[in-house]
Amino acid sequence: MKPSALTLPGYKVNEYLLVLNPHEELRNKIKEVKKEFHDVYKAPTALHGKPHIALVNFLQYAMMEERIINRLKTVAMGFYPFKVELKDFGSFPSHTIFINVTTKEPVRNLVKEMRPFQQLMKLNNDNKPHFIDEPHFTVARKLLPWQYEKGWLEYSQKHFTGRFIADSMLLLRRQAGIPDQPYQILQRLEFMNLPVTTKQGELFG
């Protein structure tokens, strides 16, 4: 994402990505799938990025960071750890191949929890937060037509299974407008399944 015009000169803009991160064994298993796809179809995006489920992607001024983290902490405090099941492959024609998440509802419910404060994630009218309502693990994106067609012909028949317990989400950050810059972990937000009254007491007590 690149910030469009209408940003305040002199103020730093960052790109943020909120994700669910699987355990190391599953991460390595997905990395192997991505590497195999790259070796056969020469798709550079298959090697980019760590395996995760993206929840929301947005641009915002660095000075807003603390307020955003506080709101995300509130969401995480009230949310419960849940099981994420992966099975086989899916695609977004005609550019992306991914690993299916079959337990979509808890992920969608989590994304829904963040919509009420989307104004905090809105840089300006041209840069609004992008909520990901179709949870998945990307194998490769931005594919050329031949890569997609041949790749999907193969991967639509392939099998994959995996599962993990999502007990937290990670807020990642990188400076906006710098291509191919890797994200850094900014904050881990643990799901605590606390009642609302406890949350408010802890935040404002």
Language-model regions, residue ranges each:
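Short histidine-centered catalytic/ligand-binding loop motif
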Residues: I97-T103
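Basic, often amphipathic N-terminal segments
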Residues: M1-K83, K104-S168, D180-G205
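Short beta-strand segments and strand-loop junctions that repeat across beta-rich extracellular domains
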Residues: L170-G177
